[in-house]
């Protein structure tokens, strides 16, 4: 592909800012616009320092520039409550939407499990689940392919400072979307999820515990060889992703313990959840350049929108 795909980021908070910093290192995508609603927000000021165009008028402030700036992709890092309308407005202009909120109106898109299938179908809206869903759904999928998972539960423990106001407003949606990912992506019959905000002390680590109830007696002989290759593959995207200790087998349920040490692009001291949420958003479109170049898929034509 001869030129980078041009992108807009909606939401200049923790996740949106971290995403911009990762995009600036990308060879195939160019962040052009940062969209917010507060002209004095630190995120918009920071985006301008990075050389991005900005608007404090929400998505409506971006729409007049979609054609002129050839915006093909938008990454929504706002809130589940406003995502559906953001997506509708930009989809009407032929802009693909990557949803980093827990809204989950599009297909769940999870690394190592179904990312290539979703991108290959050129879905106009794909949902990146949550940081917890990206970290744990592949583990559930790894177990369910060798033993049926009747019930799966994840417990996410993150440092409070890394959770921005948008995520705090969406805790219920966060838990519901993670539970849905256990079922729709991981293959569990029933899912549950909770998030625990750690305000007691600062920690670089973000920790996930996954409890599995297996329909039959858990057998570590097929389970261990099934999940270890998944961990190795996820480390290509999350270098700090690892098993905290050996999976604990004690009849039913059994548990897998994951910890993650982040890269610290933004909120350098406490970014745990950001570095799990933002890297999957970029590989979601990583196969676009090749597929577009060989005409396997074609992006929608950008045409003036008629009300």
Swiss-Prot record:
Transmembrane segments: none annotated. One of its GO terms (biological process) is catabolic process. The keyword Glycosyltransferase does not apply. Disulfide bonds: none annotated. Its EC number is 1.2.1.10. Keywords: Aromatic hydrocarbons catabolism, NAD, Oxidoreductase. NAD(+) binds at residues 162-170, 273. It catalyses: acetaldehyde + NAD(+) + CoA = acetyl-CoA + NADH + H(+). It holds the Pfam family AcetDehyd-dimer. SUPFAM superfamilies: Glyceraldehyde-3-phosphate dehydrogenase-like, C-terminal domain, NAD(P)-binding Rossmann-fold domains. The keyword Transmembrane helix does not apply. Coiled coil: none annotated. One of its GO terms (molecular function) is NAD binding. The active site is at residue 131. InterPro entries: Acetaldehyde_dehydrogenase, Acetylaldehyde_DH_C, NAD(P)-bd_dom_sf, Semialdehyde_DH_NAD-bd. Belongs to the acetaldehyde dehydrogenase family. This is Acetaldehyde dehydrogenase 1. It comes from Metapseudomonas furukawaii (Pseudomonas furukawaii). The gene is salG.
């Amino acid at each position: 592909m001869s030129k980078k795909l041009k992108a807009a980021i909606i939401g200049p908070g923790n996740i949106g800012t971290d995403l911009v910093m990762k995009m600036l290192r990308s060879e195939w995508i160019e962040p052009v616009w940062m969209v917010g609603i507060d002209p004095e927000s630190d995120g918009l000021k920071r985006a301008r320092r990075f050389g991005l165009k900005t608007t404090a008028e929400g998505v409506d402030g971006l729409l007049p520039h979609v054609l002129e700036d050839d915006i093909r992709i938008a990454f929504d890092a706002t809130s589940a409550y406003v995502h559906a309308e953001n997506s509708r407005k930009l989809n009407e202009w032929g802009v693909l939407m990557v949803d980093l909120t827990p809204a989950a109106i599009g297909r769940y898109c999870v690394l190592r499990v179904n990312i290539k299938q979703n991108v290959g179908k050129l879905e106009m809206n794909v949902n990146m689940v949550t940081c917890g869903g990206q970290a744990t759904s592949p583990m559930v999928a790894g177990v369910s392919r060798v033993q049926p998972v009747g019930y799966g539960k994840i417990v996410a423990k993150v440092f409070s400072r890394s959770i921005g106001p948008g995520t705090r407003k969406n805790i219920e949606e966060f838990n519901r979307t993670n539970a849905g990912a256990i079922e729709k992506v991981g293959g569990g019959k029933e899912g549950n999820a909770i998030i625990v905000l750690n305000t007691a002390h600062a920690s670089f680590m973000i920790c996930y515990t996954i409890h599995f109830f297996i329909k039959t007696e858990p057998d570590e002989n097929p389970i261990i060889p099934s999940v270890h290759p998944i961990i190795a593959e996820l480390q290509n995207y999350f270098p700090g992703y690892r098993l905290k200790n050996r999976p604990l087998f004690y009849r039913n349920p059994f548990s897998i313990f994951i910890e993650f040490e982040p890269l610290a692009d933004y909120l350098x001291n406490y970014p745990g959840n950001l570095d799990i949420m933002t890297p999957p958003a970029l590989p979601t479109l990583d196969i676009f350049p090749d597929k577009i170049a060989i005409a396997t898929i074609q992006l929608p034509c950008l045409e003036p929108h008629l009300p």
